[in-house]
Design a protein with these regions (language model features):
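Glycine-rich, low-complexity segments
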Residues: 1-11, 15-47, 98-121
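Short, surface-exposed terminal/edge motifs of secreted or surface/virion proteins that either
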Residues: 31-35, 55-113
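Flexible, charged surface loops at secondary-structure boundaries
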Residues: 46-52, 86
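Residue-level detector of intrinsically disordered, flexible termini
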Residues: 48, 73, 91, 118-119
Length: 121
């Protein structure tokens, strides 16, 4: 196994050189995925000057750097985009919708309230 099963964090191999690189990559992913907040899931064009640690859910019509990464998480780290394939159960707060979404394995769905009070919570 070269990555963890839930968050796909890279594991350090026995005898691996430059262990700090793998360790730092895992920390970057962990920092992004824990309490995941994305700016949007409908913005097809990557921002021209994204802030470090910006995150987006790439829509199907993504262009530029987002092209070919539909439904992936796009994380801007170290001056470039890192694309992660979501796993079932991952949750994200989508800022421009003010809603939680959950990856079902095939799509991002708005999380449903579990209370009989519905959206009142």
């Amino acid at each position: 196994m070269s990555a963890t099963p839930r968050l796909a964090l890279p594991l350090i191999a026995a005898g691996q050189a430059q262990k700090h690189v793998t360790h730092n990559e895992a920390l970057v992913r962990l920092d992004a995925l824990l309490h995941l907040v994305v700016a949007s899931r409908t913005q097809a064009v990557p921002p021209a000057a994204p802030d470090e640690a910006s995150a987006y859910i790439v829509p199907a019509d993504g262009t530029g750097a987002f092209a070919g990464h539909a439904e992936a998480l796009a994380l801007f780290e170290d001056g470039g985009w890192l694309f992660l394939t979501p796993r079932p159960g991952w949750q994200a707060w989508v800022v421009d919708e003010a809603q939680h979404h959950v990856w079902t394995g095939t799509q991002w769905r708005r999380a449903q309230p579990e209370s009989s009070l519905g959206a009142a919570l």
